[in-house]
């Protein structure tokens, strides 16, 4: 069991991801603290395995309750590429590269998935969040990060990058995974 009021550490080198998680956490009265350090990522096709392994290794270093988030963009017409290699693909071929790969393809359906793993050294639990949508025809918007400028969530006409953080979090894969984590944390935290 976790003591009420304990800050949960977040290991990420992505400042935007931490800001997004901190904003989501406010809705659940959960305090997060940014842990600075190298997130060790194994090579795997499974986001959950990547997230769980990174959380276990992070706990060995920080020795405190923490979460690790690994996310990916899965494009149906590209056989779910880039998937767990999303960050690498973003840093190499980028948004324009994905759009180029989809030139002339009508089915632009895709989804974002987050595997958010919590550990406190006693337990390890992973929470999955998914948002379905499609890849836009062009880069649109200047908010958000990563592939936000080309991802349109289901039920929307705008990309994530055309939405405020609050609007994005109504749809976000990360917000959905965090909501499951918050529900778990409520039952796992000691009652006063």
Curated annotation (Swiss-Prot):
This is dITP/XTP pyrophosphatase. Mg(2+) binds at residues 41, 70. One of its GO terms (molecular function) is XTP diphosphatase activity. GO terms for cellular component: cytoplasm. Substrate binds at residues 12-17, 71, 145-148, 168, 173-174. It comes from Saccharolobus solfataricus (strain ATCC 35092 / DSM 1617 / JCM 11322 / P2) (Sulfolobus solfataricus). Its EC number is 3.6.1.66. InterPro entries: dITP/XTP_pyrophosphatase, ITPase-like_fam, RdgB/HAM1. Coiled coil: none annotated. Homodimer. The keyword Metal-binding applies. The active site is at 70 (proton acceptor). GO terms for biological process: nucleoside triphosphate catabolic process; nucleotide metabolic process; purine nucleoside triphosphate catabolic process. Its cofactor is Mg(2+).
